[in-house]
C-alpha cells in the first residue's frame, strides 16, 4: 500500500507539472492549428495522464482523458481542424481534468468531485466531435490518391495499434505499454494475505522497472526523430548529420544515469523551515558583529582581536553565502503565474467579443516562491481591466484606425533587489478629467481636491475603494472592487504600483516588488526609546538640517531640498511616541520615496544600516497599521519594521507645525525665576515629604509630590513639563526606587534627568545597585537641610543664594 501511495504522489506531481504549460499550449494551438509538434506535446499530456490514471483505477479521470485523447489524436491525423468552438470543449475538459486532479490530491479518489454531470456532458461533446469528424475523414480518404491512401492507412494502423495497446492490452502487445499483461491469472481467493501482499509488491516493482525503461527509450528516440526532417531539407551535409546523431546517441545512452542524480524534489515545508533557520543564523551573525565591536572598543590594540576579526568575518561571509543559496532554492520563474494568462485572455476575448493578443516577455525572471503565489490575483485583476476597460470594441478600433486586434503586453525583469512587472495595453487610456469627475460624483474627493490634483494623482483614483469607470456592471468588472484590493495586496508584499497613461494611446501599470520577503536591508532609526527599521529600498537619502531650513506652508511644515519642496512629518507623530525637539540642535530627516511620492520623516537619531529578518507580529497584532513586522537587532533589542506605504498614508492626515513645537520647547526651557524650576519628591512617608518640603521652601522652587514609584512614573510621563530633578525613596509600595529609576532610564528624553536617592540604605551593595539602576546622587537619611538644598541646587543648576 505504501508503494501504491508513492506512485500516486509521483503521478500527481507529474500531472500538475504538465498542466502548468497546458493552457498556454492550447491557446497557441488555436492560433497555429498546423503546428504538429505542439499538437503532439498536448496529446502526450492527455495520453500520459490517461495511462497513469488507468493503472491507479481512477476511472472517471481515465474516461475523460481517453475521450480527450481521441479528439487530439484525430487532430494529429488531420481529421479534425481545431476551431474556436472545438477548443472551447477541449479547454472545458482540461478544467474538469484539473478539478479531478485536485480532488484526487485532497481525497485520494476521483469520485465525489461534485462535477459528475459536467464531466458526462463534456465527454458527450468530445465523443460528438470525434464521431462527426471521423465520418468526414472517411469521405476525404476515399477521394484521395491511392498512394496517399496507403500511407494514411499505415499511419492509422500505427496509431490504432498504440490505442489498442492502451485500451485493451493482450498477450501479443504487452512489451511496452502493459508489462503486466503476460502475467498468469492467479487465484487470489485461495492465497494468504502475506502471499497476496508479496505478489502485489512484485507486480508494482515490475511496473516501475518497465516505466523506467519506457522513459529511457523515449529519451533515446526523441532526438533522432527530430533530426529526420532537416536531413531531407539539407541533403548536402549528411556527414555532419551523422556525427551529430552519433554524438546524440552516445549522450542519450549516458543521460538516464546522470539525469536522475541532478535534481531531487524537496517538500516546500522543509525549505520554509530551512529559511527560518537561516533567518535565526543572520540574527546571530548580527549579534556576533555587535559583540565584536564592543570587545574591539574595550580591548583596543590587543593581539587576539586580529584572530577574532578573521573568525567573525569568515562566519559573516559563510552565513551570507548560505543565505543566498537557500534563497535561490526558493526562487521560481514568474512564468508559473504568467502561463495561465493566455487562456484567461482568450476566454475574455470571446466573452467580450473583442480580438485581443497577449504578449509575454521575461517569464524566466525568478522570484521568491511565496511572492509568486501572492502576485497571481493582483495580475488577474489588472489584466481583466485592461481587456475590459482598456481595449476598445472592434468597431471603435476600426473608426480610430487602430489594428483590429488589441494588444496586452505582460513583461518582467530584474531591477536591483526588485522585480518589475509591467502590464501595458494599446487601448483608449485613462482620461484624468473624467476620473476626477467620477470621483467627485461618487464622493471620493471634493472639487477643491480635484483642482490641485495632477494627472498622475488622478490615475491613482482607480485604487480608491468603490471607484469604477464602468457604465455597466458586467461579469468581468464594473463593481468598483478589485483595484483597491490590488494596491493593498501589492503593498503587503512591500511593493509599489505606478500608472502611466495617455488618452487614445494606452495604459501602462508597473509593479515593483522585492525579490524576497524573508530578509531585507533596512535603515535603523530611533525615536526616544523606540527603534524602527525602514526598508532601505524606500530610503532615498538622509539629511541633517537646522531649524532655520524648516518652513511653514498652509499650516504644515515643509523642507526645501535642492529644487524640491517636501512635506515634513515626525515619526513620533505617526506612531504616537513621545519625542523631544531641541530648538538649538539639528534634526535628522529620512527622505522616503514610494512611486512618485516623497516625504521627509524626522527622527531623533540614526543607528545605521543592518540586514534584518522579518518576523510576523502574530495573530493579534498582525494588522497594526503602519507596521509590517518586527525583528531582533544585533544588540538583542526588538525593532519594529515600518510598512512604508501605510506610513505615508498615515502621514497625510497629520498637520503639525514643527517650528511651533520647537519654539514651545524653547519657551519651556527658559528659566526666568526660581519658581520655573521643578523638583519631584517621591516618598511613601508623609513625614519625609514634609521634611523635604520645609528644606526646599527657601529656594522658591516648585515642588511636586508622589507617594510611590508608580505614581511618580505616571506623573513624569504624562506631565506637561519635565522636572529638573527627582528625589526618590528606595523602600516604597507598588514600585520601589530601583525599579522607578530603571523605568525612567528607558526613555531617551529622561536620560540626563538627575535622580537623587534619599534612603537609609548605606551599604556598598545598595549604592552599587542604585548606580546600576540609574541614580545620579545618593543622600543618606538622616540628612541636614543645608546638605539637601546644596545637592538639589547643584543638580538643577540653580545659581545664586535663594535662601
From Swiss-Prot:
Where does the Response regulatory domain start and stop, copy by copy? Answer: 678-796
Q: Which InterPro entries match?
A: Bact_Chemotaxis_CheA (IPR051315), CheA-like_dim (IPR004105), CheA-like_homodim_sf (IPR037006), CheW-like_dom_sf (IPR036061), CheW-lke_dom (IPR002545), CheY-like_superfamily (IPR011006), HATPase_C_sf (IPR036890), His_kinase_dom (IPR005467)
CDD domains attached to this UniProt entry: CheA_reg (cd00731), HATPase_CheA-like (cd16916), HPT (cd00088)
Q: Where is this region: Disordered?
A: 134-185, 209-255
**One of the GO biological process terms:** chemotaxis
Q: Which domain of life is it from?
A: Bacteria
- Histidine kinase domain location is 270-517
Q: Where is the composition biased (Basic and acidic residues)?
A: 136-166, 209-226, 233-254
Broad EC category: transferase
Consequences of knocking out this gene? Mutants are unable to colonize mice.
Q: Which GO terms describe its cellular component?
A: cytoplasm
What Pfam families does the database record attribute to this sequence? CheW (PF01584), H-kinase_dim (PF02895), HATPase_c (PF02518), Hpt (PF01627), Response_reg (PF00072)
Q: Where is the CheW-like domain?
A: 519-653
Give a short account of its post-translational modification: Autophosphorylated.
Catalysed reaction equations from the record: ATP + protein L-histidine = ADP + protein N-phospho-L-histidine
Locate the transmembrane regions by residue number.
none
PTM 4-aspartylphosphate: list the residues: 729
- One GO MF term: phosphorelay sensor kinase activity
What keywords tag this UniProt record? Kinase, Phosphoprotein, Transferase
- The EC code for this enzyme is 2.7.13.3
Give residues where Phosphohistidine occurs: 47, 273
Job of this protein: Member of the two-component regulatory system CheAY/CheY that regulates chemotaxis and colonization of the gastric mucosa. Functions as a sensor protein kinase which is autophosphorylated at a histidine residue and transfers its phosphate group to the conserved aspartic acid residue in the regulatory domain of CheY. In turn, phosphorylated CheY (CheY-P) interacts with the flagellar motor protein FliM to cause clockwise flagellar rotation and bacterial reversals, as opposed to straight swimming when CheY is not phosphorylated.
What's noted about domains in the record? Contains a C-terminal CheY-like regulatory domain where the phosphate can be transferred.
Full protein name:
Sensor histidine kinase CheAY
Q: Which organism is it from?
A: Helicobacter pylori (strain ATCC 700392 / 26695)
Amino acid at each position: 500500500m505504501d508503494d501504491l501511495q508513492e506512485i500516486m504522489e509521483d503521478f500527481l506531481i507529474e500531472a500538475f507539472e504538465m498542466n502548468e504549460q497546458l493552457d498556454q499550449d492550447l491557446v497557441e494551438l488555436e492560433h497555429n492549428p498546423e503546428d504538429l509538434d505542439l499538437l503532439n506535446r498536448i496529446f502526450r499530456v492527455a495520453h500520459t495522464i490517461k495511462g497513469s490514471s488507468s493503472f491507479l483505477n481512477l476511472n472517471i479521470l481515465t474516461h475523460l482523458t481517453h475521450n480527450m485523447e481521441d479528439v487530439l489524436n484525430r487532430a494529429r491525423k488531420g481529421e479534425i481542424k481545431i476551431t474556436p468552438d472545438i477548443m472551447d470543449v477541449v479547454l472545458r475538459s482540461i478544467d474538469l481534468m484539473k478539478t479531478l486532479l485536485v480532488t484526487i490530491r485532497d481525497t485520494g479518489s476521483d469520485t465525489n468531485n461534485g462535477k459528475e454531470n459536467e464531466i458526462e456532458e463534456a465527454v458527450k461533446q468530445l465523443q460528438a466531435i470525434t464521431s462527426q469528424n471521423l465520418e468526414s475523414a472517411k469521405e476525404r480518404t476515399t477521394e484521395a490518391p491511392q498512394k496517399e491512401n496507403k500511407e494514411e492507412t499505415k499511419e492509422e494502423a500505427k496509431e490504432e495499434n498504440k490505442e489498442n495497446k492502451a485500451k485493451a492490452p493482450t498477450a501479443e502487445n504487452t512489451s511496452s505499454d502493459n508489462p503486466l499483461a503476460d502475467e498468469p491469472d492467479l487465484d487470489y481467493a485461495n492465497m494468504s494475505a502475506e502471499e497476496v501482499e508479496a505478489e502485489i509488491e512484485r507486480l508494482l516493482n515490475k511496473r516501475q522497472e518497465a516505466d523506467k525503461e519506457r522513459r529511457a527509450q523515449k529519451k533515446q528516440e526523441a532526438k533522432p526523430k527530430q533530426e529526420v526532417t532537416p536531413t531531407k531539407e539539407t541533403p548536402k551535409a549528411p556527414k555532419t548529420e551523422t556525427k551529430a546523431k552519433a554524438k546524440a546517441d552516445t549522450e542519450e545512452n549516458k543521460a538516464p544515469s546522470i539525469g536522475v542524480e541532478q535534481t531531487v524534489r524537496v517538500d516546500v515545508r522543509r525549505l520554509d523551515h530551512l529559511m527560518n533557520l537561516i533567518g535565526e543564523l543572520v540574527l546571530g551573525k548580527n549579534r556576533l558583529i555587535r559583540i565584536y565591536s564592543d570587545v574591539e572598543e574595550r580591548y583596543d590594540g590587543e593581539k587576539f582581536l586580529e584572530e577574532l576579526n578573521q573568525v567573525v568575518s569568515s562566519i559573516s561571509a559563510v552565513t551570507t553565502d548560505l543565505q543566498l543559496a537557500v534563497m535561490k532554492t526558493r526562487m521560481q520563474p514568474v512564468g508559473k503565474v504568467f502561463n495561465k494568462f493566455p487562456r484567461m485572455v482568450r476566454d475574455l476575448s470571446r466573452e467580450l467579443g473583442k480580438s485581443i493578443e497577449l504578449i509575454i516577455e521575461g517569464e524566466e525572471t525568478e522570484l521568491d516562491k511565496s511572492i509568486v503565489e501572492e502576485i497571481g490575483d493582483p495580475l488577474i485583476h489588472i489584466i481583466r481591466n485592461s481587456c475590459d476597460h482598456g481595449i476598445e470594441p472592434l468597431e471603435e478600433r476600426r473608426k480610430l484606425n487602430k489594428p483590429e486586434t488589441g494588444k496586452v503586453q505582460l513583461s518582467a525583469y530584474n531591477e536591483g533587489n526588485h522585480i518589475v512587472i509591467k502590464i501595458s495595453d494599446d487601448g483608449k487610456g485613462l482620461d484624468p478629467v473624467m476620473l476626477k469627475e467620477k470621483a467627485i460624483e461618487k464622493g471620493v474627493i471634493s472639487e477643491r481636491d480635484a483642482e490641485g490634483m495632477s494627472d498622475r494623482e488622478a490615475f491613482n483614483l482607480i485604487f480608491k475603494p468603490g471607484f469604477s469607470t464602468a457604465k455597466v456592471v458586467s461579469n468581468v468588472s464594473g463593481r468598483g472592487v478589485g483595484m483597491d484590493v490590488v494596491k493593498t495586496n501589492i503593498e503587503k508584499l512591500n511593493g509599489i504600483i505606478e500608472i502611466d497613461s495617455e488618452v487614445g494611446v494606452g495604459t501602462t501599470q508597473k509593479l515593483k516588488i522585492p525579490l524576497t520577503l524573508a530578509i531585507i536591508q533596512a535603515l535603523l532609526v530611533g525615536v526616544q526609546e523606540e527603534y524602527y527599521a525602514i526598508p532601505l529600498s524606500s530610503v532615498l537619502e538622509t539629511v541633517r538640517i537646522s531649524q532655520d531650513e524648516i518652513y511653514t506652508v498652509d499650516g504644515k511644515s515643509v523642507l526645501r531640498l535642492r529644487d524640491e519642496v517636501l512635506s515634513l512629518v515626525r515619526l513620533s507623530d505617526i506612531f504616537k511616541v513621545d519625542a523631544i525637539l531641541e530648538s538649538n540642535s539639528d534634526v535628522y530627516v529620512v527622505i522616503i520615496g514610494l512611486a512618485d511620492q516623497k516625504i521627509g520623516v524626522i527622527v531623533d537619531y540614526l543607528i545605521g544600516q543592518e540586514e534584518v529578518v522579518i518576523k510576523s507580529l502574530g495573530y493579534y497584532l498582525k494588522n497594526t497599521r503602519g507596521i509590517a513586522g518586527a525583528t531582533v537587532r544585533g544588540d538583542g533589542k526588538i525593532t519594529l519594521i515600518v510598512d512604508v506605504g501605510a506610513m505615508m498614508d498615515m502621514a497625510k492626515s497629520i498637520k503639525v507645525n514643527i517650528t511651533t513645537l520647537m519654539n514651545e520647547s524653547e519657551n519651556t526651557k527658559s528659566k526666568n525665576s526660581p519658581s520655573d524650576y521643578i523638583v519631584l519628591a517621591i516618598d511613601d512617608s508623609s513625614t519625609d515629604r514634609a521634611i523635604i518640603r520645609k528644606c526646599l521652601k527657601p529656594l522658591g522652587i516648585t515642588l511636586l509630590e508622589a507617594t510611590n514609584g508608580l505614581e511618580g512614573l505616571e506623573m513624569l510621563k504624562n506631565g506637561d513639563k519635565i522636572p529638573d530633578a527627582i528625589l526618590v525613596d528606595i523602600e516604597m509600595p507598588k514600585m520601589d526606587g530601583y525599579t522607578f529609576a530603571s523605568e525612567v532610564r528607558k526613555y531617551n528624553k529622561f536620560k540626563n534627568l538627575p535622580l537623587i536617592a534619599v534612603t537609609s540604605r548605606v551599604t556598598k551593595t545598595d549604592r552599587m545597585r542604585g548606580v546600576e539602576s540609574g541614580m545620579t546622587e545618593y543622600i543618606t537619611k538622616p540628612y541636614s537641610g543645608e546638605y539637601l538644598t546644596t545637592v538639589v541646587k547643584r543638580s538643577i543648576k540653580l545659581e545664586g543664594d535663594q535662601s
